[in-house]
Regions:
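Basic, helix-initiating cap at the start of DNA-binding domains
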Residues: 1-45, 49-58, 64
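Amphipathic alpha-helical segments used for helix-helix packing
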Residues: 75-81, 111-139
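Hydrophobic alpha-helical segments that form the core
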Residues: 124, 150, 159-181, 189-201
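Hydrophobic alpha-helical connector segments
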Residues: 88-117, 168
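Amphipathic alpha-helical packing segments from all-alpha helical-bundle domains
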Residues: 118, 131-158, 165
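Short amphipathic alpha-helical segment with a characteristic S/N-K-E followed by hydrophobic residues
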Residues: 49, 72-77, 87-88, 100
Length: 208
């Protein structure tokens, strides 16, 4: 959806939405337009210039309409770049590297997105100022990913020689740092290297 897609008629729709109507459901098209505008502006103008007013103009809605959905710019950006239901290991082939290499590549490719690379430095500052935003991010995105990794290990009949949360953090930290520093350059080779490191810390589960 382009940033200008909700101008004109949509402004009228937004004005109607602004009117207080008890029980009226929120229009998901407006939510999508706001999130898309946020991602576009992060790439074009950077974190600091991506203001609520700029987002509203790009999305073709009013600033109050944005604030009714998200209490702050940081909350909106955090949700736009780190939505719920993020990545999980997929097919269990019996070969851990074969399973984990595409998973690592998926994470690295995702984190290398220009909008995310633009947002992360600003969000890290916001997390220090507003710890509740950090906790919200962990609950929505990070902890579900960690749990899905644990579930994958259990299904594959493997256990970690170190605590599995530490192993996941090492894996994600390596991918996160690479994405910020290098983007997607050499992503496939790096993802395979990380998968090999993770595999080296695994062993068959006793009794599996």
């Amino acid at each position: 959806m382009s940033g200008q897609a909700m101008s004109g008629e949509s402004m009228a729709d937004d004005a109607v939405e602004d009117a207080p109507r008890v029980g009226r459901p929120r229009d998901p098209r407006v939510d999508d337009a706001i999130r898309q505008a946020t991602l576009e502006l992060l790439v074009e103008d950077g974190y600091q210039a991506t203001t609520i007013q700029a987002i509203a103009r790009r999305a073709g809605v009013s600033a109050p309409s944005v604030y009714r959905r998200w209490s702050s710019k940081a909350e909106l950006i955090e949700e736009a770049v780190f939505p719920s239901g993020l990545l999980a290991p997929q097919a269990i082939t019996g070969d851990i590297i074969t399973d984990l290499q595409p998973y690592c590549l998926q994470i690295l490719t995702y984190l290398s997105d220009p909008a995310i690379r633009s947002a992360i430095p600003g969000l890290l500052v916001e997390y220090q100022i507003h710890p509740e935003l950090w906790r919200q991010s962990m609950e929505r995105s990070f902890f579900p990913m960690r749990r899905s990794f644990d579930a994958y290990l259990e299904q594959s009949g493997r256990s970690s020689i170190v605590p599995s949360d530490a192993l996941f953090d090492v894996m994600l930290g390596a991918l996160f740092t690479r994405a910020l520093n290098e983007g997607a350059d050499g992503a496939e080779e790096f993802a395979r290297s990380v998968a090999r490191v993770v595999t080296a810390a695994l062993q068959p589960t006793k009794g599996a």
